[in-house]
């Protein structure tokens, strides 16, 4: 299986005020591949990632998953569920009144897991990141790095087929950023997901299978 991006164009506005943000983007990401998107601010990275996640529609072009359009005419996933696309953002966005384990179990239950299945899965993921002793604490009791690790495991809770990460390490120091990206890469490889991450940090490029450079809405050679 692969995610195939074919000639994606995105314009904002109309007429004289029209801005061309993406100008014919083409690339492919295979199952189990971890790809980094890089480029200056305004190059179109976040717009592209937002389109891939179904949060924004393209002006023209097609995104294919498993040889079929990723989204139907109503902009709903056509060959997978919404839960099959996982998002990781720069900020953790944890729910302040939920304990750490609840941040994950509620996601699992909303996706159809039983309470027991969800709990088992959440505990295992939290063990993977060394937070098994923090299951019953609240977000305000966690460090910034711990919050981001919980948010990452929350994105992996439903075994998504596609992971989209937008600057998940931007607020972290170099050591924590490295650990976070190692964690993301490990999950993508172990569960054979399609992974795409935006980052400006060139120190993290070595963890990607491939780096795609964007400039002025186009992929550079």
Swiss-Prot record:
InterPro entries: AAA+_ATPase (IPR003593), ABC_transporter-like_ATP-bd (IPR003439), ABC_transpr_LolD-like (IPR015854), MacB-like_ATP-bd (IPR017911), P-loop_NTPase (IPR027417). Keywords: ATP-binding, Cell membrane, Membrane, Nucleotide-binding, Translocase, Transport. The gene is hrtA. PANTHER family: HEMIN IMPORT ATP-BINDING PROTEIN HRTA-RELATED (PTHR24220:SF666), IMPORT ATP-BINDING PROTEIN (PTHR24220). PROSITE patterns: ABC_TRANSPORTER_2. The complex is composed of two ATP-binding proteins (HrtA), two transmembrane proteins (HrtB) and a solute-binding protein. Pfam families: ABC_tran. GO terms for cellular component: plasma membrane. Its EC number is 7.6.2.-. GO terms for molecular function: ATP binding; ATP hydrolysis activity; transmembrane transporter activity. Belongs to the ABC transporter superfamily. HrtA family. It is found in: Cell membrane. It is a peripheral membrane protein. This is Putative hemin import ATP-binding protein HrtA. Part of the ABC transporter complex hrt involved in hemin import. Responsible for energy coupling to the transport system. Induction: Highly induced by hemin. Its main location: membrane. Residues 3-221 form the ABC transporter domain. ATP binds at residues 39-46. The keyword Transit peptide does not apply. It comes from the Bacteria. It comes from Staphylococcus aureus (strain Newman).
